[in-house]
Amino acid sequence: MRIREQTILALLSPGLPPVTGQHVLDLSEPGWTVSSKALNRTVPGRLPSQVHLDLFEAGVIATMGSMILTFAGLRMPTGRTPATLLLGCELTDHESTWLVFDGLDTFTTITFCDQIIGSTYNQFRQYHFDVSQVLKECKQEGPVLSINFGSAPNIANAIANGPSAEEWPAGVQITNEYPNRWYIRKEQSDFGWDWGPAFAPAGPWKPAYIVQNKNPDRLYVLNTDLDIYRRGQINHLPPDQSQSWVVNASIDVLGSVPQWPSMSVEIKDAYSGVVLSSGLLENVTVSGNSVTGVTVVDGRTPKLWWPNGMGDQSLYNVTIAVHNHRNQVVAEVMKRTGFRTIFLNQRNITEEQLAQGVAPGANWHFEINGREFYAKGSNIIPPDAFWPRVTPSRMERLFDAVTAGNQNMLRVWASGAYLHDFIYDLADEKGILLWSEFQFSDALYPVDDAFLENVAAEVVYNVRRVNHHPSLALWAGGNEIESLMLPMVRRADHKGYAKYVGEYEKLYISLILPLVYENTRSITYSPSSTTEGYLHVNLSAPVPMTERYSNTTPGSYYGDTDYYNYDTSVSFNYHKYPVGRFANEFGFHSMPSLQTWQQAVDPKDLYFNSSVVVLRNHHYTAGGLFTDNYQNSSRGMGEMTMGVESYYPIPSKSDPVANFSAWCHATQLFQADMYKAQIQFYRRGSGMPERQLGSLYWQLEDTWQAPTWAGIEYDGRWKMLHYVARDIYEPIIVSPFWNYTTGDLEVYVTSDLWEPAQGTVNLTWVDLSGKSIAGNAGTPESIPFSVGALNATDVYSANVADLSPPDLTDSILILSLAGEGYLPNARTRSEFRHENQFTPVFPKDLALRDPKLELAYNPDTRTFTVEATAGVSLYTWLDYPAGVVGYFEQNGFVLLPGMKKEIGFVVQEGSVDEDWMRSVTVTSLWDQKVRE
């Protein structure tokens, strides 16, 4: 970062200027070259970048779209050597010079002026090196900086084969493609995962700087930990909302911290500029290169920050300055933040809750500013296989889709990478809570001293770096370590199980937990993404948190759930879904659209079982460096096929590309319906004994063009899933629950409002021509409802056998809700509408009719009008051509004959003209079965 040359000296001594004489050179300037001995090539390079990107830019790699698993030549060590950097003769005149690297991926040897100045071995750490003396003795006319990157797969293998490498029972560690990822601190999915490629890139993936201070009193800010919490707040206990706000600021600096420093702060509304508070920080301390101070915001009430759908995202700019004994500013930094408390409640169910009908056990839900809320969202993976391609504009489009989809929380999955600050900034602005995790996933990890020391530095840096963001919701130790890896090692080595539990606790509880709590009081920590919670916490104990593990009681509920079932015969059997307090992962994979496949695959390969398409399906992963493991990939293709054939019309079009497109769409229908069934089930749990308060499906978006669990494709196009999730994440919904074995049908209204809501549910039976069924098939036409705050209520139940539709294959029940209530923090009542549907047979068995859809575009309103003229249109689907990123305001809906629906299209990137508008199409389930 560049030091901001702004001061707040008026707080102390108006006449004194800041200490000057600092020069920061951003190394993102042109002039770098990349050389690879393995490829015997030298090409222009960039910083930030990764070697694959530079080789692609130079034409060494013909097309990024054709990359399947890896390039043999790029498995070799690669080097990065810049052109000579003429930094100017003033460099030698400065008192001190440092090299600062915000992120190097991963193993490097760094040379400056022909001298080795250091090495790095952790992708997630910030590194800095004092090169003052090296520069003064430099004999080069223009100092040359060279960074040599080693091959992460080769180094991981070398560590694994070393004499002191820890070993685990056979069959426990999960190799996706490259082995031994658990030995190194690099993005774990770079070695392959079931939703992405294994490129194992190398390069300077974040910015780098040369920092020079001419004045020895000047400091450079490396990192800032800004912690805002209620007085008396402790991480794992609910904060007292009546207490004053505490602002604790800690700055990590380069340079010599002056004796007796003071600190000042100014807090301004980020939008109006109105000053909330300003003055000196108290209890200023110096520890190593960190300066820390604290203040209490007494007598002032900042505007609170709320997640999407719960209120405003009020933000404040906090300027923190360090002063020397002459009251001169020697370091200054500004961070944008918000005032909120976020708390993961894992405490035991209280007597009051038991009296309300909540089942015994322990809570597992989030509370924002003291209020329980329903977490609606998904899991976010790395948006690209190469982080330098992830830009602010790209992430803004993605997060706009998140908020448009009625989501308020994303789980930042481990093991990708810790998110950039600009991504947290966007989440702050848009009200998206980010459940964040340390980068450990689906593996057991070493616990030797060197590994733990490396991890400790990684944890401290990243906790401090992102702590000021109000969107930060949680720190979790890793992905599925407790729920997947410990059971696996227990089965593999029952006698040695205690050893591995001890190692788990050593890393995630004895090491990471205290480091988190030492650097923040505002965020809760959980050792694993999926857990039964804890029994008790004693921060002075060697193992400060005692996990519950399997110490559970029948009839009680604990923790969160993680659920995948690829047996498609039970996909819609909600008795198979887990009953818990919170669902953090669940899902099924589907194909991307034809338009997305065309970005990456040659036209000749556009059919369902082509080798290119099959091998892009990494469910199931190759299990090693086998680029042609058709057997594993075909299993995933078979699961999607079974999902379609079990429930939907089987596409059989004469045109092969059209048939491929129809099959891709069919897999999306199955995926969307399966997620809808589960989300409805979990949301209904808010009013059940389990008191279920969270649904985060797997996964939000894609990292490349391939069959995955994503709801948003690689370029931003929405699958059917994201439209359906948007609908079923509305504040108040009506949902049918059908036990297709017994025939029992139940209808529930679910609300995530914080106050009771009232309204009416209309039930209308029609046949597939759109005609009303006599007597409404024995169902009442209208039912009033009243649903409690953050709750669910049943409004109707019957057995389908007791109803009177004349032909189950020619019947559909339309459920329409109209209600009123107050949105969270709203002062006026709002109207809510929701529509759902139920068919007493699966879609493949319906007596479908051609709805004869008509589509018109109005250039004045820039909207599309869809009309069904001859029958009920199921899964009405508007599709748009390539060249634009955007989404329709509604999609995947039911349309009765004679009804018109006006729908807008939101353009996120690109532009549209009348030719493009005329290329928009509309289809329905009928078109899936029609042979063209």
From Swiss-Prot:
Active-site residue list: E480
Signal peptide span: 1-21
EC number(s) per entry: 3.2.1.25
Glycan attachment positions: N40, N248, N283, N317, N348, N538, N609, N632, N659, N739, N762, N791
GO molecular function, one term: beta-mannosidase activity
Biological role: Exoglycosidase that cleaves the single beta-linked mannose residue from the non-reducing end of beta-mannosidic oligosaccharides of various complexity and length. Involved in the degradation of polymeric mannan and galactomannan.
Quaternary context: Homodimer.
Protein name: Beta-mannosidase A
Biological source species: Aspergillus clavatus (strain ATCC 1007 / CBS 513.65 / DSM 816 / NCTC 3887 / NRRL 1 / QM 1276 / 107)
Lineage: Eukaryota, Fungi, Dikarya, Ascomycota, Pezizomycotina
